[in-house]
Amino acid sequence: MAVNETAEVSVGGEQMAIHTSRPDGADKSPAIIVIQEIFGVNNNIKSIAERFANEGYFAAAPEMFHRSGSGIDIPFSEMEKAFAERGKLSGDNIEDDVQATIDYLKNNPNVDASNIGIVGFCFGGMVSYLGSTNTDISAAAIYYGGGILPRPDAAEGTPRLLDATADAVQAPIIGFWGDQDGGIPVSNVEEIEKTLKAKGKSIENHVYEGAGHGFFCEDRGSYNEAAANDSWPKTLAFFAEHLK
């Protein structure tokens, strides 16, 4: 049974809560950072952290929206509010939050600090991709990470995160995508893979037919049971290979 707790760390002089879930009685466990969607660290994200704990990992889900307050949990129906919160975060903010979470894990007696992975969903998938450039991260899993390449409807000249960061990727990546995701066309997924492989990076992508954005979240209308049930064991196998 997992032990669920909340810690607080300082980021730029502000407090950030980190929701943790770890194996009961475990000495040192490999760790996985679980990055939220644009809705905050809600019950879905906390349950994913607990699922990882039940598989033997110390899971840590930082509240990336802490600059707007603690415990932010935006309803799935309030997309405009969710995008507004995400829009407040700069690249430096994201990097600082991830590093603060890593530092917390490295100083935690229950964590094997040499084996830290990261997984993220939606906005968090992009954060997980960025995490793969951090030398403290040993493996990164991306679930429909938006923003690595511009959306099809993005304004001309929108920055291409992939171009700016691909050279720095150092951790192996596994990605899970839906072919019905309106914001992330399969052509983007293919370009991400082609670009990274051309630079000698390790990436393995899985694209699910009929699945849309948010297919892993049981609480969303976009939940796709087949895609969710196939991606989870693949995620566990990936982390077991690189973190255990």
Model regions and ranges:
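N-terminal cap/leader regions of alpha/beta-hydrolase-fold enzymes
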Residues: 1-244
